[in-house]
Design a protein with these regions (language model features):
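Oxyanion-binding "anion nests"
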Residues: 207-234, 238-240
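Acidic-histidine catalytic/liganding microenvironments
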Residues: 26, 221, 264-265
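N-terminal Rossmann-like NAD(P) cofactor-binding subdomain of oxidoreductases
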Residues: 1-196, 201-205, 297-300, 338-345
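Conserved active-site and cofactor/substrate-binding residues in soluble primary-metabolism enzymes
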Residues: 14, 125, 149-156, 205-212, ...
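C-terminal active-site/capping subdomain that shapes the small-molecule cofactor and substrate pocket
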Residues: 242-345
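Alpha-helical scaffold segments in soluble metabolic enzymes
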Residues: 18, 22, 156, 160, ...
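Short, solvent-exposed beta-strand edge segments and adjacent coil->beta transition regions
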Residues: 141, 236-240, 304-306
């Protein structure tokens, strides 16, 4: 059995480190190179102590990269697109974990990222990395733009309902509680422990960047408004979404939509239990896993539907999603290397 050789560019960050963790346990992958300009020469366990005993690799500089089968780019937004000529000849398959190649509309990219796209000619060569929506396009794909974490929690929650073609009478509101790891490994005033710990802080009331992905991927052109709140947790996103169904529709239709679209999905679980503590999705139960749990409650009197989605932002929201895409692209079992469940308690 020949394993594909993998290099991770930007492997000292949380996203790159999480892909590294998953890839080291994947039976079809062999991680041969991990880059970090700041930590070049240090063992990867210097930054990722959870990987002790799993690998003797050391970080290297990007200039030292050698050709591989799969190149994973885990760089700050903008870097992959601006420097893509340095990477494209290094691997047959390239997966980008940043936002650089997700958004196909150049005006939307400029609106939400504040600059013209640095490499617009490359956009059409990338498949948007959401397996539940783009499984067919991902088969055999050579370039994959992994979906954003908050966007994933919103898109997966709403897609079955918007696919129905129901004329929802009001705008859709999405509010996400986001763990601190979503901000990345670099420290800032906002991530300073005395400021972040125990705090629920709205950090993007309107104009969240992932709005562009949500609008691009969801059918129906419904107005969807995102608000992001920093939560005290380290991992996880819990998103609540509010929409109103028109007269003539009921909870039975909501159930039917989710069952029809997600009935056979390996990583989506519909959580709707009548009693007990765990009646709704909880991101704490998904730590380290590639699952997305979705639940809902319907107020028949007002027609309001509250949808809840939970993911681990570093796994289903980033690295696990990327590995799921790679499995599909290579024709492997989609769940390969991702079968594990979360932790409890």
């Amino acid at each position: 059995m020949t394993r594909l050789k993998v290099a991770i560019v930007g492997g000292s960050g949380y996203a790159g480190g999480e892909f590294l963790r998953l890839a080291l346990s994947h039976p079809m992958l062999e991680v041969t190179q991990v880059t970090s300009e700041r930590n070049a020469g240090d063992p990867i366990t210097f930054v990722h102590p959870n990987l002790r005993g799993r690998s003797s690799l050391k970080f290297r500089k990007m200039a030292e990269l050698e050709p591989v089968d799969v190149l994973v780019l885990a760089l700050p937004h903008g870097n992959a697109a601006k420097n893509f000529s340095e990477f494209e000849g290094l691997a047959d398959t390239i997966i980008d974990l940043s936002a650089d190649f997700r958004i196909k509309d150049l005006e939307q990219y400029k609106k939400y990222y504040g600059e013209d796209h640095p490499a617009p000619d490359l956009l059409s060569s990338f498949v948007y990395g959401n397996p539940e929506l783009h499984r067919d396009e991902l088969r055999g794909a050579k370039r994959i733009a992994c979906a954003g974490c908050f966007a994933t929690s919103v898109i997966l929650a709403l897609y079955p309902l918007l696919k129905l073609g129901v004329p929802y009478p009001k705008d859709i509101i999405a509010t996400g509680l986001v763990g601190s790891s979503a901000a990345g490994a670099s420290s800032s005033d906002a991530s300073h422990h005395p400021e972040r710990a125990g705090s629920f802080r709205v950090y993007q009331a309107t104009g969240h960047r992932h709005t562009a992905e949500v609008n691009q991927e969801l059918p129906g052109n419904f107005p969807i408004h995102l608000t992001a709140i920093a939560s005290p947790s380290i991992r996880g996103i819990l998103t609540t979404l509010q929409l109103w169904i028109p007269d003539g529709y009921s909870e039975r239709d909501v159930w039917s939509a989710y069952r029809e679209v997600y009935g056979d999905e390996p990583f989506i679980r519909i959580v709707k239990v009548r009693k007990g503590l765990h009646r709704y999705p909880d991101p704490k139960l998904l730590d380290g896993s590639n699952f997305c749990d979705i639940g809902f409650e319907t107020d028949n009197e007002s027609g309001r539907v509250v949808v809840m989605s939970a993911i681990d932002n570093l796994v289903k929201g980033t690295a696990g999603h990327a590995l799921q895409c790679l499995n599909i692209a290579q024709g492997w079992e989609e769940t390969l290397g991702l079968e594990f469940v979360g932790l409890h308690p």
